[in-house]
Amino acid sequence: MALRQALSIAIDMEEFVSIFRNGRGIAAQSPLPPGIYGYRDGEAGIDHYVYDWVDGHPQRKPVEYAKQLLREVGYPNGIDATTGKPLTLYLDTTLVGPEAKSRADWFTKQLRKIDVQLVVRATDLNRFQDKLRDGTAQLYVLGWNADYPDPENFMFLLHGPQSRARGAGENASNYANPEFDRLFEQMRNMENGPQRLQIIDRMIEIVQRDAPWAFGFHPADYNLAHGWVHNLKPNTMANNELKYERIDPLLRERRRNEWNKPVYGPLLALVLLGLGAIAPAWVAWRRRERHRVAVQQDGNKS
């Protein structure tokens, strides 16, 4: 437990979001994202095993505290006190390419802060899925898009009976805690209310303490839309938003006419510029013509 807490402290998701997401996201404090019933903002919602509340904001606990946790469980300076061997962990990933290499290097750097060695193992998707089913994957990175906006659809990912290795469920970490499982069964079909919220609070507290996940981040995306587009509420859960959107064609046409009025200034400037370039040539041509006519007339007189 202390080892997992130390890893959670070391993996600085605020830095990850800043580097790889250009700041578009917030570090997760629990399995529940903002907007889902049971999510708590502010000091009430932070993971107190990973963060301190400082000046009105969550602040990740220092690396030295994570190292202290490792010493308490027998890994001083990342060395197994019993065998004398360095603590080495393995991260399985299916990502390839330059960005994947950058992310792998970043994870390696995070664990190096607490003197833990990380070996990144690239693998194909089928082999990766086999490792999850067999329970042989040690560290991995997964995300989740909910099927519906209810805390049950997030908490079930940690429900013991739905273990990937033992029951072919979605609990890929194979986490099992009897109290959590019992509370999940109570909570899953309850109506939202004080009793359900109390149960959810306790479930989150258990998961934060046990740290089966090093919580990642909740993505934040930005969308731009014209004023004539209505019923637009982008989210990361639904993929059928278009059926609800409405276009105001009259407003669209009015805006197009306002924004696309003819602008004659540049055209007039271009015409004047062209005339300015042609005028000297035309004057020179007229002079040559007059001279030619004068010469021709003098020849006829003689």
Task: Identify what each model region corresponds to.
Residues A27-V73, L95-S102:
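Structural transition elements
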Residues L273-R287:
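Alpha-helical transmembrane segments
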